[in-house]
C-alpha cells in the first residue's frame, strides 16, 4: 500500500464525498465549492493551527447549529457509525464463511466477482476510514496527529493491528482450507487492483491539488482556513464577527507567517506589506498575540473606504480654495521691501492641531497668517476689552530709547519741555490711494474703485490675502529701526474701526490689521519709540474722504444713521481703551487719538464737541492715562482759544498744516513759502499752544510737498491745482508762474528723486526743516508720512535716504530765524 503522505489535500476530495455519503442530512452542500488558501506541505505546524482555532472558539464562546458541529463531535459520531458498519461487515463475513464451508472452493465467475467486489469495498472502506479518522482530527488535536505519525502509543497499536492483519493473510495463504484459500485468492487480487487504482488516484489528486492551489493563489480571497474548512466542512463564524486569516504551509513552516512576524501598534520592524508577500493566496493578516482575531475586518474595510471617500470629498474642495487663496498670496520667495521674505519659522515644531476647531481658519489661526515673524503663535483665546491678545508675548522691556536726547520708555517723556519729533505710518493699516496707488491703478474709472470700501468690495474673497500681504510687507521691523536711526522718537499709527469689528454690509477685512497694529507697537517698544494711536476710519465716515474708508457722504453724527454711528464709535473706543489701558502699554502708548479730521465745517460743531468730551471721559474711566488728542476739525486755530475751556485733563489739540490745498499758498514761490512757515505758522502754533490759546498743541500731519501733483492725492481720477486739471469747469492753474509763464508741470515734481537737482533738494530740505522749527514752538510734530510707493515728497523715508531731509531729525541744518538760503537757478514752475 502506498505510503500515507501528510499532505491534507491528497484525500480532500474523497473526504468531502465521504461526508456527503455518511451525513446526507447534515452536510451543507451549498458550501462544497470552498476557496482554499493552500500550500502543499508535508509538515504543517498543525499544533499551531489547532491552537489558533481552539483559542478562537473558546474566545467566541458560541454553540454550533446542527449540521455544523465541531470536529470532535464529528469524530465521536463517526466512530460510532464506523463501529456499527464494521459489525455489519463482520456479520456478513461470518454468514459468507458458514455458507462457503459446505461448498466447493471453486466458485462460479459470478460469485468470485461478487466476492471480489465485496472484498474491495470492505478494504476501501477500511482505508477511507483510516484516512478519514486521521485527516479529520489531525488539525483539531496535535497529539492525535503525532500518534498517527507513529510517535505515540496509538501509532504502535496501529502498527500491531497492521502486522496482525498481514499475519492473518499469510496464514490464509499457507492454509489448505478451502475457505481460507478462497479468501486469500480474492484478497490478493483485490489488493493488487486497489494498489494500482490508488496509485493512479494519487497522481490525479496531486495534479488536481497543484491546479487548485495555483488557481487559489490567483483569487486571494479572504477566507479563513481553519481545521474543518480544510477538509470540506464549513467553519461556523460567530454572528457579527469577521473571519481571521490563518496562514499555513510553507510560509508558516519557514517562520514567515503573520503570527511569526507582525508589527504591532507601537512595535518596531518593517511594515506588514514588506514582511508578508501579497501573492500565494494571501489577503490579510493575523495578530500573533491573539491568534484567530482578525486584524482587518470586512466591515472595517468598508467603513475605512467610506471614511477615505468622505475625507476626499471634504479635502479636495478645501484644497482648491486654499490653493486659490495662496495663489493670491505671495509665495515663500516674495520679497519684502528690505529684500527679505516673510518668515514663518516660528511655526516649526508646532502642530496645526494645537488650534481649536472653532478657531481654525480664523484670524486666531497662525497657519492662515501671511507672516508670523515676531508674533507669539502659541494659541490663546484670551481677550481684553473683547480684543484678542493672540500674537503677543507675555513679557516686555521698556528700557530702550531712540537716542540720547530722549529718555527711555520707562521714564516719562517731558511733554511741553521737549518737542515730539515723529512720523506717520499713513496708507498702511488704513489705505490711502495716493500712498499706495498700485491698489487702484488697475481699475478703470467706470469700476468705481476709489477707496478701501470699494476696493475690498471689488476684491471680494481675495481682499483678505491681498491686504494682509500689504500689512506684512509695506511696513516691517526695518522701518522702525530706520525711524529710530533718522533721529525720530514718536510714531503716529493709523487704524480704522474694522481692525476691531465690522457691521452688516461692510466689505472691509475684519480684525487682521489689529494683529499688525499690536506688532508695530512692539517694534516701537523695541526701538524706544513712543506711539500716538489715531483712528482714521470711524463708523459712518467722519469726513467723507477716501482715507476714512469710504468716500462720499458723512454718516457719523449726521444723516439717517448718524446717531447709530455715534454709538458705534463710542463702543469701539470702549474696547480699544480697555485694551490699551493694560500696564504693558502705559509707557509706550502715550497719546490716544479720538478721531482723525472730523469735518467740522460740515458737521455740527456742538455735536462733535459733545461726543469728544463723552469719549474722553469713557476712555479715561477705562484706565487710559495717556494724553487724549482731538483734531481741530479744520476750524481756524484762533477759534480754539474759546472752545472747550472746561474739559477733561490731559487733552491735546491736533492740527494738520499743508500749503498745497490752499490756493492762496500753493502759488507762493520757494522763498516765500519758507517765510510763510517761519513767520506766520510759527506764530500761529505758538499762540494756540499757550495758556491763552487752547493749550498743548501738536501738528499731527505736514509734508515737504510743494505741489499737489502726486497721483490720486486729490482723489482717484481727479486732476491737480498745479496744472489746472482739478476742476472740470475751471482750468485755472495754481502755481507761481501761472500768470507769467511758463506753464507749470507735474513732470519734475513726480520725477524719480535721483533726478532731482541739487537746488531742488536744498529747497525741499529747507522747507521741511522750517516746518519742524515752527511746529516745535508747540508740542512737536508728526511728518506725513513715512513711506509711499511713488510720491517722494510725501515720504520721509525717501527724503532721508535721498539726501533732502536732515540725517537726524533733532539736528536740522535750518531753523526759523536763520537766513533763507539761495536756491540758485531753481525754476518756480516746479
Swiss-Prot record:
Instruction: Kindly list every residue the record annotates as glycosylated.
Output: 331, 376, 381, 393, 546, 558, 610, 636, 669, 689
One annotated GO molecular function is: glucan exo-1,3-beta-glucosidase activity
Catalytic activity reported: Successive hydrolysis of beta-D-glucose units from the non-reducing ends of (1->3)-beta-D-glucans, releasing alpha-glucose
The EC code for this enzyme is 3.2.1.58
Keyword Glycoprotein carried by entry = yes
The record places the active site at: 597, 701
State the SUPFAM superfamilies in the record.
(Trans)glycosidases
Membrane-spanning residues: 302-322
Q: Which domain of life is it from?
A: Eukaryota
Question: According to its record, what are the GO cellular component terms?
Answer: cell surface; extracellular region; plasma membrane
* Topology in membrane: Single-pass type II membrane protein
Intervals, Cytoplasmic compartment: 1-301
Q: Note down the stretches annotated as region Disordered.
A: 1-279, 327-351
InterPro entries per record: Glyco_hydro_5, Glycoside_hydrolase_SF, Glycosyl_hydrolase_5
Write out the function statement from the record: Glucosidase involved in the degradation of cellulosic biomass. Active on lichenan.
Cross-referenced PANTHER family: GLUCAN 1,3-BETA-GLUCOSIDASE 2 (PTHR31297:SF34), GLUCAN ENDO-1,6-BETA-GLUCOSIDASE B (PTHR31297)
What's the name of the protein? Probable glucan 1,3-beta-glucosidase D
Native source species: Aspergillus clavatus (strain ATCC 1007 / CBS 513.65 / DSM 816 / NCTC 3887 / NRRL 1 / QM 1276 / 107)
Q: Give the gene that encodes this protein.
A: exgD
